[in-house]
Amino acid sequence: MKQPYLLLTPGPLSTTASVKDAMQIDYCTWDSDYRHVTETIRQQILAMAQANPENYTTVLLQGSGSFGVEATIGTAVPRTDATLMIAINGAYGHRISQIAEYYDIPHIDVVFNEDEAVDPVRIEATLADHPEITHFATVHSETTTGILNPIEALMPIMHEHGIVTIIDAMSSLGGVPISIDELDCDYLISSANKCVQGVPGFAFIIAKQATLAHTADNARSLCLDLYDQWQAMTKQPGKWRFTSPTHVVHAFAQALIELQAEGGVTPRYQRYRASQQLLSDGLQALGFELVIDPAIQGPIITSFKYPNVDFDFADFYQFIKQRGFVIYPGKVSNIPSFRIGTIGDVDTTDIQRLLTIIGDYQQLHR
């Protein structure tokens, strides 16, 4: 079946034909070959994230990226004598807060405007005001707008206060250079269908073993017990506790091969960045304003304001879709906007074609 359009979205995204082909065979979860693939993936993820395997482990978890976030929050934070600080500047930070609410976890939300990055100075001031804080969570690439938050500046602050750190790197790991060894974070979460360019079906959590080892019995959920999942994968390498998405795992294994063939994370970041820059410059030339300052813009997805009050996004969307691309509606709460992603099997040639299509639309609606 021919793919009718490219996804210019933050994931699920457009994948290569070879990633799709990897899902054409059925696999047995107990088979040694399959378990070898799973175990290899776990080690490759550590290498991709520059995480020392003597200190860190990768835990794979069935479900979407949010399953991974919920499992981490629900396992990392003890049932008593713990308070979670959440730095929020978009919908995915608010989702962490929702998880804390569901689990009755005491939490302090430090909320920023959606068009501003998390400010380390304000975070440090909050820590000074709240000595009860034991854990910290934030989103690296907040795809509500496309902001890339300054995790490199935040982690040293947390270390000074002995805070356990949780980074939602759903839309950055694999597409933005990250060194977990340098960050020295406790948990970093991502998903198969983001910058590694696999398909949806599982999340993965890179966890500091010394921290995770103290989380037994913390989990509020059987299926989302990160500690128990880790123990199962450690005692029986390649084994998941419950039925794993076998086809998705093989697609991800192929996607990792292709990431290496591209040269690794840095060349992929450069491709994403080139596409984002072309998109940003091109749409501004066509009359669309950016939602956020380019200084805090990441390469994953870009938000644009509606050009005027009469702009019909539904009509705009269909015009573009009929010509081979799918984009995203806006998620900023108080600014009418739309979003366009620049990750996946997409390059500047595709972005230039999109700009031509949008230029044609603008000509028709002058």
UniProtKB/Swiss-Prot annotation:
It comes from the Bacteria. GO terms for biological process: organic phosphonate catabolic process. It holds the Pfam family Aminotran_5. The modification N6-(pyridoxal phosphate)lysine is found at residue 194. Homodimer. Involved in phosphonate degradation. InterPro entries: Aminotrans_V_dom, NH2EtPonate_pyrv_transaminase, PyrdxlP-dep_Trfase, PyrdxlP-dep_Trfase_major, PyrdxlP-dep_Trfase_small, SP_NH2Trfase/AEP_transaminase. The gene is phnW. Its EC number is 2.6.1.37. This is 2-aminoethylphosphonate--pyruvate transaminase. It is an enzyme of class 2 (transferase). It catalyses: (2-aminoethyl)phosphonate + pyruvate = phosphonoacetaldehyde + L-alanine. NCBIfam families: PhnW-AepZ (TIGR03301), PRK13479.1 (NF010006), transamin_PhnW (TIGR02326).
